[in-house]
From Swiss-Prot:
<comment type="similarity">
    <text>Belongs to the zein family.</text>
</comment>
<dbReference type="InterPro" id="IPR002530">
    <property type="entry name" value="Zein"/>
</dbReference>
<keyword id="KW-0758">Storage protein</keyword>
<protein>
    <recommendedName>
        <fullName>Zein-alpha ZG99</fullName>
    </recommendedName>
</protein>
<dbReference type="GO" id="GO:0045735">
    <property type="term" value="F:nutrient reservoir activity"/>
</dbReference>
<keyword id="KW-0732">Signal</keyword>
<dbReference type="InterPro" id="IPR051903">
    <property type="entry name" value="Zein-alpha"/>
</dbReference>
<keyword id="KW-0677">Repeat</keyword>
<comment type="function">
    <text>Zeins are major seed storage proteins.</text>
</comment>
<feature type="signal peptide">
    <location>
        <begin position="1"/>
        <end position="21"/>
    </location>
</feature>
<keyword id="KW-0708">Seed storage protein</keyword>
<dbReference type="Pfam" id="PF01559">
    <property type="entry name" value="Zein"/>
</dbReference>
């Protein structure tokens, strides 16, 4: 009797466990394979053999697709690094061409600037010498036109620059230089001797102003400068 009761209890327990049991379906390969990207390797066909290996298999497949691209990326990077000096050289050539076009477009101004470059350097180093040189610039042009006649004055400028500047400052007041350069050069050749005769610059200036009115100076400057001067004044 007890054995029958025990068997009945066992049957009731089995029936209750069967009623409450859950059914877990087996993993299907087709749905998971449809979710995978098409560019992965064929090794993904065996991914669903074990669900635990799924992340590892996917990681291996992605790595297998990326690794072949790495050498190509490195080659492109090295090629870009090698082309950087060529890019800099090309930029320098473009700048040089632009400067050359600018110089050709304004060649006259560029040449004039290059001619005045030594004077600009002299002005930066010694402003007094630069101003003195600018005062002598018109006379330098006349000396370039008549170099042989101006040779004594160049020697005077080398020996006594102060006397030479005083002498050249009187040049604009001489009307003879504008009328007859040849006669004026003859007069200038006698001027160093005349400076010893008339040491007063004011008297010499008055004499230069009266020079156009003296007919003897216009016809014969040598004879004019041989005339005596009494008391440092002209009568």
């Amino acid at each position: 009797m007890a054995a029958k009761i025990f068997c009945l209890i066992m049957l009731l327990g089995l029936s209750a466990s069967a009623a409450t049991a859950s059914i877990f379906p087996q993993c299907s390969q087709a749905p998971i394979a449809s979710l995978l990207p098409p560019y992965l390797s064929p090794a993904m066909s065996s991914v669903c053999e074990n669900p635990i290996l799924l992340p590892y298999r996917i990681q291996q497949a992605i790595a297998a697709g990326i690794l072949p691209l790495s050498p190509l990326f490195l080659q492109q990077s090295s090629a870009l690094l090698q082309q950087l000096p060529l890019v800099h050289l090309l930029a320098q050539n473009i700048r040089a061409q632009q400067l050359q076009q600018l110089v050709l477009a304004n060649l006259a101004a560029y040449s004039q600037q290059q001619q005045f470059l030594p004077f600009n350097q002299l002005a930066a180093l010694n402003s007094a010498a630069y101003l003195q040189q600018q005062q002598l610039l018109p006379f330098s042009q006349l000396a370039a036109a008549y170099p042989r006649q101006f040779l004594p004055f160049n020697q005077l400028a080398a020996l006594n620059s102060h006397a030479y500047v005083q002498q050249q400052q009187l040049l604009p007041f001489s009307q003879l230089a504008a009328v007859s350069p040849a006669a004026f050069l003859t007069q200038q050749q006698l001027l160093p001797f005349y400076l010893h005769t008339a040491p007063n610059v004011g008297t010499l200036l008055q004499l230069q102003q009266l020079l156009p009115f003296d007919q003897l100076a216009l016809t014969n400057p040598a004879a004019f400068y041989q005339q005596p001067i009494i008391g440092g004044a002209l009568f």
